[in-house]
Design a protein with these regions (language model features):
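Hydrophobic helix-and-loop "lid/oligomerization" segment in the mid-to-C-terminal part
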Residues: 1-99, 104-137
């Protein structure tokens, strides 16, 4: 019985984490129109949870997204889609345009859009610029 309670608590904690991530995603998602398709762009969701959160977003009728793109600090984009949209083609072409590779499956794919060090440099520039503006210390 003790082991059952332990797994029940783990399941509850996991479901709470997913619910919190879904709420976060709905707050930070940005709309992007791509050739008449509604894309949702999200920054800050760990790769381990992207497929689960994408499914929740893509099949939520109130949100009505056809593609979800997850941007991350490593300079990569992960795409998820529903219906007839082949995001592997998008990832492949986007990766080629920016000089990196990309691809995957019809409904789940990804590509690199910039180097990790380049992304870090840009983030540090934004951080430094912002810190210099507040003049607290």
């Amino acid at each position: 019985e003790e082991i059952f309670n332990y797994f029940f608590l783990l399941d509850e904690a996991y479901n709470l984490k997913i619910d919190n991530l879904f709420d976060f995603a709905k707050r930070v998602i940005s709309d992007f129109d791509y050739k008449g398709y509604k894309l949702g762009v999200i920054y800050g969701i760990d790769g381990d949870y992207q497929s689960i959160i994408a499914d929740k977003i893509l099949f939520d009728k109130k949100l009505d997204y056809e593609v979800v793109a997850f941007l991350n600090v490593y300079g990569t984009v992960s795409f998820r889609s529903k219906n007839d949209i082949d995001v592997s083609d998008i990832a492949k072409k986007l990766g080629m345009i920016v000089g990196y590779s990309g691809g995957g499956h019809k409904h789940a794919s990804g590509c690199r859009i910039c180097d990790r060090d380049e992304m870090k440099k840009k983030m540090m520039e934004i951080f430094e610029h912002s810190m210099n503006k507040i003049k607290i210390l």
